[in-house]
Amino acid sequence: MSHASIIASSEFFSAASPAVIDAIAASAQEKSLVRGDVLFKEGDAPDALYIVLSGRIAIAIDNKPLDSRESVVALMVEGNLFGDLALLDGGARSALARALEPSTVLRIPYSAVEPQLSNTPDLLCGITRVLARRLRAMDEALADSVFLDVTGRTAKRLLELSEGKDEFVLPVTQEELAGMVGA
């Protein structure tokens, strides 16, 4: 699949014209990662967004300096886009992104996207949908942390990870699952 078709299939760029997609794709580069590789850390200066081509990427917030635990706030799989928040507000990275297994991502420099935001207001529609979905997910996670105990949060997350199947292979380690549910 070409970089342009990968970018076009992302809801983030759903309102972009083929010409805009091609302009963005011209600057995109694939990056291979091994388990444990960190794409960026919380506080880093941002310069790109990413689309997962293969593997899994954890988006996590750590609890330092209190202890070495981290909370996995999102699990990015094939087709997911991440690293976009700083594109919109210019702030530093708000979390870290780490490969959970051998992975490949498509790196899209902000410098390729920013001019398109000014020239293509429709592009903001797809971005707004993505951000609204993430905000709803964070609202739900906050409610879960308040109203469900660890057992309830674990059961709910396992149901989500099963994708409705009766039998499935758990795609995360016990430690990663604990980070996802705040245990």
Language-model segment annotations:
Residues 64-70:
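Short, solvent-exposed loop/turn segments that connect beta-strands within catalytic domains
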Residues 28, 46-48, 168:
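Short loop/turn microsegments at loop-to-beta-strand junctions
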Residues 72-132, 136:
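Cyclic-nucleotide recognition modules
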Residues 39-44:
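Short phosphate-coordinating micro-motif centered on Lys-Gly-acidic
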Residues 100, 118-183:
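Polybasic "coupling" helices that flank or enter modular domains
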Residues 1-35, 86-88, 119:
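Cyclic nucleotide-binding regulatory module and flanking cytosolic helices
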Residues 36, 47-62, 78-79:
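Glycine- and acidic-residue-biased ligand/ion/polar-headgroup-sensing regions
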